Amino acid sequence: MLKLFRETGLRFLWISALAFILDQWSKYTVIDTMSLYQSIQVLPFFNFTYVHNYGAAFSFLENAGGWQRWFFTAIAVVVSVVILWWLKQSPRSQKMLPVAFAFILGGALGNVYDRLVHGYVIDFLDFYVNNYHWPAFNIADSAIFIGAALLIIDMFKNGDKKSEENGAESKAGSANSSETIK
């Protein structure tokens, strides 16, 4: 069992656990110290603003009648199971992708927990410029964003290597087939 954790992407589950714990700790701190819709200015462009999000990212489908709670929960659970399976399958040599998926998993589980326990996601990080406010978000959303950014970086970083490898394999295959034809 320990070998499974040492030799696969499961070795990065501590990142998921840390993201989940930080997310829940921050949300409970907000619940205990702020009232709903209260806003506390931290910097000239950043507030803590306690809100409930019944939808998905950017409050998508927030007023859809309640079915979205279970829909987004189901999606997050399925994605989490797929990520766990993928982490188990990933070899020790891979680093960036398992780390990215570990961040996404921790964030997904943080928001799933909110939906199951509260019926909504607790958001409180509020960035703004003048009167334009970016939609409020939380630590779980940040973990998902970090994971997605790492996936994109890996795609550009390792996509070139894979293209080169595929090109080399293709050339080798062409050379072998032309030798066979002669």
From Swiss-Prot:
GO terms for cellular component: plasma membrane. The chain crosses the membrane at residues 12-32, 40-60, 70-90, 97-117, 136-156. Residues 173-182 have a biased composition (Polar residues). Coiled coil: none annotated. Its main location: membrane. GO terms for biological process: proteolysis. The active site is at D123, D141. It comes from the Bacteria. Residues 161-182 are annotated as: Disordered. InterPro entries: Peptidase_A8 (IPR001872). Its EC number is 3.4.23.36. It is a multi-pass membrane protein. Pathway: Protein modification; lipoprotein biosynthesis (signal peptide cleavage). Pfam families: Peptidase_A8. This protein specifically catalyzes the removal of signal peptides from prolipoproteins. HAMAP family: LspA. NCBIfam families: lspA (TIGR00077). This is Lipoprotein signal peptidase. It comes from Alteromonas mediterranea (strain DSM 17117 / CIP 110805 / LMG 28347 / Deep ecotype). The lineage of its organism: Bacteria, Pseudomonadati, Pseudomonadota, Gammaproteobacteria, Alteromonadales.
